[in-house]
Curated annotation (Swiss-Prot):
Gene behind this protein: Rbfox2
Residue numbers of Omega-N-methylarginine PTMs: R323, R423, R428
Protein name: RNA binding protein fox-1 homolog 2
Species: Rattus norvegicus (Rat)
Function: RNA-binding protein that regulates alternative splicing events by binding to 5'-UGCAUGU-3' elements. Prevents binding of U2AF2 to the 3'-splice site. Regulates alternative splicing of tissue-specific exons and of differentially spliced exons during erythropoiesis. Seems to act as a coregulatory factor of ER-alpha. Together with RNA binding proteins RBPMS and MBNL1/2, activates vascular smooth muscle cells alternative splicing events.
Subcellular location: Nucleus; Cytoplasm
Length: 432
């Protein structure tokens, strides 16, 4: 009975804190401790060293002052017992303490207040989170590096591309080396071009730099500067779109010239259409007339008198060969072939009119010798027309052989007189 009494009185020796908690959970206090024998003192003796060891470990790992080990001891529960490092603290108390001390786990190793499972999760999650953040950071750095490399390559490509500048209002005596010398101080120049016409420089040109950055710097420095009293302007040259469109003729005969204008320039060709259908104005602009033997002959609406003695078959064949050619240069061979044969004068017309389609206007201009020296008889008119045809060189009259060329001022300011002044080497539009 004495031993039984000692066994019943043994549990209150666990400590003051454990006695209070044991009164709330009497069934838990009377449960046998695993690993203990039939003797009563062994459960209390087995619980005391483990609690003290856990308190010692907590004091070593914790830098802050903690409570006494007896106050931290928790009684055992009926659930399966936790592993030994937890020292009897149930898992239901571990979760709130883990939340309270989650931010201090990296600084303090409080193994007493938290279970190993939350710490394991935190330790396993934190490296993965750190690795994920590092991976994201590295990926972002790689992306930023790629973008910066792309931007730098684009900038280098844009700077390395050649650029063309338009320079206007430059002095008229400037030539390509002068322009190259003026712009060469800013960078390498690929090409320099000054635009000229038949009277000299037009006062503007183009400079092509190898590097667009050099071109921009030259444009900023030289734009608005005064060179030899002229304020030059430097701007970016705009690309001119060169369209190679085929010229569509609006006329039925295939010529690039209006029939009215063509009849003025070469009346013989259009008069020959009554004999050759190839150079007719077409059915739209001609009146069909039934000729002898049922042959339809197209008479043009522009009715011109036929010139006797004119070689119509030859002229018509030549004109048909050159149909569609531009009259700006190449088409003159048509009229040159027509004028090769000295035409006969038309008695019904005044003597000043002769069959030279291009240069008939010169006679109205200012040459009194032609106006009064032309006799009214047909024989003299024929000789004068032949002389006038031989006098022409096919493009412009050689005015240097004219006896009235040296007169100053000219007799009158007709077309031929003013043209002779320009062809004689004098031009009031010459820059210097």
């Amino acid at each position: 009975m004495a031993e039984g009494g000692q066994a019943q009185q043994q549990p209150p020796q666990l400590g003051p804190g454990a006695a209070a908690r044991g009164m709330k959970r009497e069934s838990e206090v009377e449960l046998p401790v695993p690993g203990a024998g039939a003797d009563g003192p062994e459960p209390g003796l087995s619980k005391r060293p483990r609690t003290e060891e856990a308190a010692d470990e907590g004091m070593q790992g914790n830098q802050e002052p903690t409570t006494t080990p007896d106050a931290m001891v928790q009684p055992f529960t009926t659930i399966p017992f936790p592993p030994p490092p937890q020292n009897g603290i149930p898992t239901e108390y571990g979760v709130p303490h883990t939340q309270d001390y989650a931010g201090q786990t990296s600084e303090h190793n409080l193994t007493l207040y938290g279970s190993s499972q939350p710490h394991g999760e935190q330790s396993s999650n934190s490296p993965s989170n750190q690795n994920g953040s590092l991976t994201q950071t590295e990926g972002g750095a790689q992306t930023d590096g790629q973008q910066s490399q792309t931007q730098s390559s684009e900038n280098s490509e844009s700077k390395s591309t050649p650029k063309r500048l338009h320079v206007s209002n430059i002095p008229f005596r400037f030539r390509d080396p002068d322009l190259r010398q003026m712009f060469g101080q800013f960078g390498k120049i690929l090409d320099v071009e000054i635009i000229f016409n038949e009277r000299g420089s037009k006062g503007f040109g183009f400079v092509t730099f190898e590097n667009s950055a050099d071109a921009d710097r030259a444009r900023e420095k030289l734009h608005g500067t005064v060179v030899e009293g002229r304020k030059i302007e430097v701007n970016n040259a705009t690309a001119r779109v060169m369209t190679n469109k085929k010229m569509v003729t609006p006329y039925a005969n295939g010529w690039k010239l209006s029939p009215v204008v063509g009849a003025v320039y070469g009346p013989e060709l259009y008069a020959a259409s009554s004999f050759q259908a190839d150079v007719s104005l077409g059915n739209e602009a001609a009146v069909p007339l039934s000729g002898r033997g049922g042959i339809n002959t197209y008479i043009p609406l522009i009715s011109l008198p036929l010139v006797p003695g004119f070689p119509y078959p030859t002229a018509a064949t030549t004109a048909a060969a050159f149909r569609g050619a531009h009259l700006r240069g190449r088409g003159r061979t048509v009229y040159g072939a027509v004028r090769a044969v000295p035409p006969t004068a038309i008695p019904a017309y005044p003597g000043v009119v002769y069959q030279d389609g291009f240069y008939g206007a010169d006679l109205y201009g200012g040459y009194a010798a032609y106006r009064y020296a032309q006799p009214a008889t047909a024989t003299a008119a024929t000789a004068a027309a032949a002389a006038a045809a031989a006098y022409s060189d096919g493009y412009g009259r050689v005015y240097t052989a004219d006896p009235y060329h040296a007169l100053a001022p000219a007799a009158s300011y007709g077309v031929g007189a003013v043209a002779s002044l320009y062809r004689g080497g004098y031009s009031r539009f010459a820059p210097y």
